[in-house]
Amino acid sequence: MSLFPSLPLLLLSMVAASYSETVTCEDAQKTCPAVIACSSPGINGFPGKDGRDGTKGEKGEPGQGLRGLQGPPGKLGPPGNPGPSGSPGPKGQKGDPGKSPDGDSSLAASERKALQTEMARIKKWLTFSLGKQVGNKFFLTNGEIMTFEKVKALCVKFQASVATPRNAAENGAVRNLIKEEAFLGITDEKTEGQFVDLTGNRLTYTNWNEGEPNNAGSDEDCVLLLKNGQWNDVPCSTSHLAVCEFPI
């Protein structure tokens, strides 16, 4: 049997064995893909460790979140402009008669106070032993003799003023009251020869004695009511009867 016909087959087997041992599958696919086929991929291995955090990304657009809960009520706002007045309502029914209070409660507090004040003034008037009333004035005296300044102070103490006749009737009442010459509430202390009352008003009534006022001695700044009802100017430092007038 001849060996030559089997020689080519033997050489081919040797080349194939040698190539399979030295060449990888990847290289074989590159060099001889049509001849040698690689086997199927192996099983996946275990997951590796987490990598490091990447760089911070850019801010995203606002998302559409869920609607939140209703918040608490806000502060009370300023009052609005007043509205127009409404039309008058219907007339109500007639009420029952009220009950009048009894005794002292029938007087309001202001009325009681006024009454108490008036009673206090009357008590002061009663401290004088004599008095005359003309119209809405009381002319009263306690019979004391004193200077003009003391007469003014006495009358002020009793919430009164020095007697100042405004007409013949008042002048006559004071004349009938006195038994001594009395000071009147009239002076020319501020302007010589210009007699005024103690509030500074010019006189609208006078009843000067003949030849008066004459300012004898250059210091007669006060006025005296004589027993005959006429007036005379005298020094304010002299002492005479005190007569006060009280408005009523």
From Swiss-Prot:
Transmembrane segments: none annotated. Keywords: Calcium, Coiled coil, Collagen, Complement activation lectin pathway, Complement pathway, Disulfide bond, Hydroxylation, Immunity, Innate immunity, Lectin, Mannose-binding, Repeat, Secreted, Signal. Disulfide bonds join 155-244, 222-236. Residues 75-87 have a biased composition (Pro residues). Its main location: secreted. It is found in: Secreted. The modification 4-hydroxyproline is found at residues 47, 73, 79, 82, 88. Residues 134-245 form the C-type lectin domain. Residues 112-130 form a coiled coil. The keyword Transmembrane helix does not apply. GO terms for molecular function: D-mannose binding. The keyword Secreted applies. GO terms for cellular component: collagen trimer; extracellular space; multivesicular body. Residues 43-113 are annotated as: Disordered. Residues 42-99 form the Collagen-like domain. Oligomeric complex of 3 or more homotrimers. Interacts with MASP1 and MASP2. Interacts with MEP1A and MEP1B and may inhibit their catalytic activity. The coiled-coil domain mediates trimerization. This is Mannose-binding protein C.
